[in-house]
Amino acid sequence: MSRVSQARNLGKYFLLIDNMLVVLGFFVVFPLISIRFVDQMGWAAVMVGIALGLRQFIQQGLGIFGGAIADRFGAKPMIVTGMLMRAAGFATMGIAHEPWLLWFSCLLSGLGGTLFDPPRSALVVKLIRPQQRGRFFSLLMMQDSASAVIGALLGSWLLQYDFRLVCATGAVLFVLCAAFNAWLLPAWKLSTVRTPVREGMTRVMRDKRFVTYVLTLAGYYMLAVQVMLMLPIMVNDVAGAPSAVKWMYAIEACLSLTLLYPIARWSEKHFRLEHRLMAGLLIMSLSMMPVGMVSGLQQLFTLICLFYIGSIIAEPARETLSASLADARARGSYMGFSRLGLAIGGAIGYIGGGWLFDLGKSAHQPELPWMMLGIIGIFTFLALGWQFSQKRAARRLLERDA
């Protein structure tokens, strides 16, 4: 076995262990933020939505800068620094009794993610061969789901004692992850050349097709982020107990572990990436519309099942499509910019979703936020369809001219 092949194989195991620690640390804390501050402390959902949206926007919106810096200086220093910064954010969150302190803790957490997330994504693109990426992204999603459930279960159990224990556990996991990277991650370059920060960012911004695709995905993320805000609140309201939230993540884990890899293997043989992304988005949109009209936990979990199935279909295709569009000369910059759709969509989804949830509750129209999210998903579906049809038309024109 060549040294390159050996490095790729070892890199896969490193990425899986690293991903497990990151997801565990994140899901111990973040699914319980809305339960802690909305249900236990009585804050308005929009106040918590601002905090979650701020974290999302900072982490993903500034990702292009984190990715460009990683292109210049390498992945290791960015990842270690970012994980320690997130640990500090979680520690601060444990003592948050005023909105500004919660917002500050989410700001720290988001800045940490800005540093470690793009280089981690670029390492996947660097180490995994193009023909294997779809299956590897599916494995990562399966691991995400299992780790999310374990994290949510652990966080829910700790929450009955003290929210500070929840935050301390998340902080410790990120410190461990930082130590793991500092000890074992080689000083790998992310790109084929050591690209200056400004050049990497300029290369991305000139790629109009990639920029349009990323910005359109904001609508997709407005739906996806509700697993952190409105869906946990809805489950808690219907069930009458915060402990029911863990079953929402258990459903996701069961579906992912049983369906994600088989669906990915089968669909990659029969359907294009863009068709898989659009089909998953359509299922997510349609399953979200009736959520505000249900009154029983069984009905709610059925809709959540459909939502997760849509995500299972869409997410590996989205990740693979984003990676396939990245320029090898500026991988960090491309993977950082690819998070901008999540930054915009996540911020609007959290803040707008929280505001609509409060508005619907005060106006006795609980279906309002869910119908609006479903409509946004349908419009995003149509916009992606138009983009992909334009791309196919341009390809046919080039083939005819040739």
Swiss-Prot record:
Q: Which cysteines are joined by disulfide bonds?
A: none
- Gene3D superfamilies tied to this protein: MFS general substrate transporter like domains
Q: Which parts of the chain does the record assign to the membrane side Cytoplasmic?
A: 1-12, 117-138, 186-213, 265-276, 321-339, 389-402
Q: Which UniProt keywords apply?
A: Cell inner membrane, Cell membrane, Membrane, Transmembrane, Transmembrane helix, Transport
Give a GO molecular function annotation for the protein: transmembrane transporter activity
Query: Could you tell me the superkingdom of the organism this chain comes from?
Result: Bacteria
Q: Which cell locations does it reside in?
A: Cell inner membrane
Membrane topology annotation = Multi-pass membrane protein
Report the InterPro entries cross-referenced here: MFS (IPR011701), MFS_dom (IPR020846), MFS_trans_sf (IPR036259), MFS_Transporters (IPR050171), Multidrug-R_MdtH (IPR022855)
Segments spanning the bilayer are 13-33, 99-116, 139-159, 165-185, 214-234, 244-264, 277-297, 300-320, 340-360, 368-388
> Where is it found, in Gene Ontology cellular component terms?
plasma membrane
Which regions form coiled coils? none
Name of a matching Pfam family: MFS_1
**Side Periplasmic, residues:** 34-98, 160-164, 235-243, 298-299, 361-367
Matching PANTHER family:
MULTIDRUG RESISTANCE PROTEIN MDTH (PTHR23517:SF2), RESISTANCE PROTEIN MDTM, PUTATIVE-RELATED-RELATED (PTHR23517)
NCBIfam families hit by this protein:
PRK11646.1 (NF008650)
Which family does the UniProt entry place this protein in? Belongs to the major facilitator superfamily. DHA1 family. MdtH (TC 2.A.1.2.21) subfamily.
Its recorded name reads: Multidrug resistance protein MdtH
